[in-house]
Amino acid sequence: MAEPAARHLSLPSGLLELCALLGASQDSLRGLEQIAQKRGVKSASSLVPEVLSVFVPPFTTKEDGQVPGASCALGKGRRRSFRKKREKPRMEPWKSHPGDSKGPDSEDVTIPGGVDLLALPQLCFPGCVCVASEPKEDYIHFLVLTDVCGNRTYGVVAQYYRPLHDEYCFYNGKSHWEPSVISARCFVPFAVCVVSRFPYYNSLKDCLSCLLTHLKLCKDFEVDNHIKDFAARLSLIPSPPPGPLHLIFNMKPLQVVFPSRADPESPIVDLDLHLPLLCFRPEKVLQILTCILTEQRIVFFSSDWALLTLMAECFVAYLHPLQWQHTFVPILSGQMLDFVMAPTSFLMGCHLDHFEEVRKEADGLVLIDIDHGSVTCSKSSDDNIDIPDVPLLLAQTFIQRVQSLQLHPDLHLAHLSASTDLNEGRARRRAWQQTLNCKIQHITLQLLVGIFREVKNHLNYEHRVFNSEEFLKTRAAGDQQFYKQVLDTYMFHSFLKARLNGRMDAFARMDLDTQSEEDRIDRMLISPRRPTVEKMASRKASPLHITHRRMVVSMPNLQDISLPELPPRNSSLRIMDTSNCRSSSPVLKVTPKSTYMFKIPDIHFPLESQCVQAYYTDFVTLLSKAMALLGPGDSLLLARYFYLRGLLHLMQGQLLSALLDFQNLYKTDIGIFPADLVKRTVESMSASERAQAERTPELRRLITEVFDKHGEAPKADDAVKNFELPKKHMQLNDFVKRVQESGIVKDAVIIHRLFDALTFGHEKQIDPETFRDFYTCWKETEAEAQEVSLPALLMEHLDKNECVYKLSSSVKTNRGVGKIAMTQKRLFLLTEGRPGYVEIATFRNIEEVKNSTVAFLLLRIPTLKIKTVAKKEVFEANLKSECDLWHLMVKEMWAGKQLADDHKDPQYVQQALTNVLLMDAVVGTLQSPSAIHAASKLAYFDNMKKKSPMAVPKTTSETLKHKINPSAGETAPQAIEVLLYTPGRLDPAEKVEDAHPKLWCALNEGKVVVFDASSWTVHQHCFKVGSSKVNCMVMAEHNQVWVGSEDSVIYIINVHSMSCNKQLTDHRSPVTGLAVHNGKKPSEIYSCSLDGTVIAWNVSTLRVISRFQLSYGDLLSISLHNDRIWCCTVHKILVVTPQGFVRQELKHPKDASFLAFQLLPEEQQLWAASTGVSELYMWSLKDLDQPPQKTYLQDCSEVTCMIRVKRQIWVGGRGLSQGKTRGKIYVMDVEKVTVEKELVAHLDTVRTLCSAEDRYVLSGAGQEEGKIAIWKVE
């Protein structure tokens, strides 16, 4: 893997990319003197600006003072050169004067790619360079610069005035003209522009404010030196990594704070997000957000250049994580106005003086006047631009929440004593702003979640398809235009890609945090969604729900929304009383996350290499001291210190130290690991450095990891397809894909049955017309269920979570005329005339279902007869042509309910519902005499009941309590690899729902699903720990779950945040076991890997306490007992000291392979199972040399796992039951060493077992079934 030669290492840049001084040229100033003498200052008020000086890092070179041990490969990559002749005789690499490029004194200066020096003067003086007769106040404004690749850099410009006096010597210290009285009354503007890769608007404004105090006092020939010194300081300040650590630097006289981004997915927010709320009413804010969401051509106007960029950036920040991807030029100078004629979407800004000119000349623009708080459209475009309204309920909630904000710091600070310290007062204001920013981000994110929450219901993740047509059907009529425009944007397309890629960004986190219990339950359902009775009732009760789907009444304009007792402008003065609307939008109580400050050491002489190295040394020392003071629970903060220290070691040329610091990020926060920088660092190392790194175990693994991951072929950025009906004939595989894309059903096995039904009696392919008819039938049934109008009295008879799935036509029954309705639980009659409710039967109580006929005059009318257990009278309904279908459907639901009750598995009812609805659609599609016979192919449970009725054994039924399906919603079941139960606890750091007990379920490829064990609903739907098989899980302390993987990594999951941001990479082969002491709060965890390595870890610090290597490989698991580590290998069980000395060996009596073992200290027993045999062996711990006692497991073909529960051993495997192979559990009585119970657990092998507080045992099945069973412990 060694590189043939060290490569150039481009070091990460600091805050500064470029610093420039701009103003009028020397020739212009000479002319100004002459004009001013003749005509006065007013006649010479306008000059042409240009770049006078450019300062680009690095400001010190290796030649100035080489650091011992620094790699010769270190250096800055050159991006673009700018050549100018200089008037000074001495060459300086950090500075350039634009001018004549001819002559021998020209040089190269590296200019950042996103900075166009030709356009920079116009942007730094967007109005003009105006000479003044008296000094003016300093003026700061902000720029966003974009290169041809779309990469943005950010500029902060400070304009200041200097007198044009008699010894003007700005360039080289020489006087150029004679003193004059008039020139002394001239004040000429100059600008200093700082360009950074990071949008530190407030921070860089503070820095420039400090610089201006020096520039005003210095002499002309000293200006460049001051700016150069200032630029060098900024270039040495690193950008803080994402997270809670902010950096603070003493710029004198101000302490300047550089905030970090909240997380790697979030932008840096260093501006006052409430500025738009001071300038626009909330309704206008929504309108502007809509313009951005629909990607209009937008132009901001203001008489204050500074507000243009700040306002545009605020609105873009409001829409995070959605991103504006088009042209973004917040400031246009007068010479750039033709930019607004661009035909594509853009967001630009102009001075208010140009408002009328732009309005008249350009068509189709949205014009936003910041000064007057108005939003209008340019000429002759009112008919062309249709700015739709945000959905009404979301708009009302947003407005109420915005009006509840306190937008004035004076109100917050009124009760505080006056600050006598400048920086203390600034810190107070900053804390207030941080809290307000957090609330505003929360409000806008809630708006986005409300707008797009249900998009996920119409996504197919397997084939990356979005069914926009069906999504639009679920939107209210008045919201159609809004969604149609939004769905057609690049912004929304990128949002869809992020959802399909499973990105856990701010949107996904809030969606998860705010989902209702019903949403959590819905995620576990495999049957199609329908509105519940409770939702139907609330739809009727609430007048706000008049906007529900398929309404024909249009929405009112957003501007017309009236909210009682909420005056629009008062919101910025005080907290509003929102008691009237509290039920729908309570006042937010958002607490920003805790942040920490780290003070950067002073940089005394930033242009001297030795002083710069001393600064790096001081910085490293301060970081190391801060790290030493941290407690074991401060891993997030520790990670930031490691990151910064790693960067500083790179600057010092200490590559090995840098890599060791970056390697520590695996144990503290892998989320900020700079993989690309580490890879480039390794590539830049000399042969000797690389060899030294390879000799360090931690770095050897780090290098392998980074190069392996980067060696993988980059995944294609798969586009999102919009669902379309097929246009060609489909074979089985294509049909499966199309049905999954449509969102009708995902389970491939069910789709295979559907294929057989639709092709019954025909060639085994489906034509486009049949598919279209089937899809239409399905969607029409879905729409009918959405529009069912149920009488109010019905709510008293049905459960709140029941849904009406099917309604018959109006029929005559022996209990009245009406429509038969089917829910997942029962059949009932909706009587006509006077609306009423007559219960027919619950599926549990059905005793018999018959399809017969009754005579009427000369006709035989098909009739459905249903007999129930509790009632003597048989229900009869003259269903006529619908009779055969209802007969099939009722029998399938009855069979599904019986299976659900027998197996304690509600998923059977959900699957029966899916089968029933598919039957209905098949009959509606085929409309032929054979349609019913074709539909019967889908009556899976009824057919199974007829062909091979299997009674659940009594012992199994009595012990089994419940079953859950972690693979619900997947295309096929997945094997359960490992289960872990963690008890609930009420921790101040946890939300109430987080305090519930949890069940952690590891599926294939590193997927982990977390269930709330108090309700068995999904708590966290599938996150990843690597991409390999999970072998073991254990709980450490109360907030960590450790996961051992086949890829040799231990992943650590934070229980509070449900994130996996730590990894232990010390093992070199698959991690096979994790063990903790049985104490309440284990301080140590032992891990083992297949190669025989055993490592003891400190849980708090994640440091290795001890490690040893067994001479035997194939280490399968470990257990702790009596200060010894018991190790199970394939061939032996070993008793080992914590130091790694083997004290005892236990061999298999038949030279077979061990599979697992369990220790029972109270009974002084050791139980072991073997691979491929159906016997258990029990040794006495008193004398392991004695031959073991053997127990034979009847009808067992394989043992796969075993656990100890109280005074029992539960053994999982597979064996015969009623002539078929099933997953089985044997419960062993440890005293009698006999089988106490034999449980028929699953359709597939029992793969794993775990105990829940010794009250329940949970078993996980193989891939054929993929379910979890919950068993009561006697």
From Swiss-Prot:
Keywords of this entry: Cytoplasm, Guanine-nucleotide releasing factor, Phosphoprotein, Repeat, WD repeat
Biased composition regions of type Basic and acidic residues, renumbered to the chain: 89-105
Repeat keyword on record: yes
Ranges of biased composition (kind: Basic residues): 76-88
Compartments it resides in: Cytoplasm
Gene Ontology annotations of biological process type: endosome to lysosome transport; protein catabolic process
Subcellular location, principal: cytoplasm
UniProt domain cDENN: residue ranges: 268-400
Protein name as catalogued: DENN domain-containing protein 3
Organism (species): Mus musculus (Mouse)
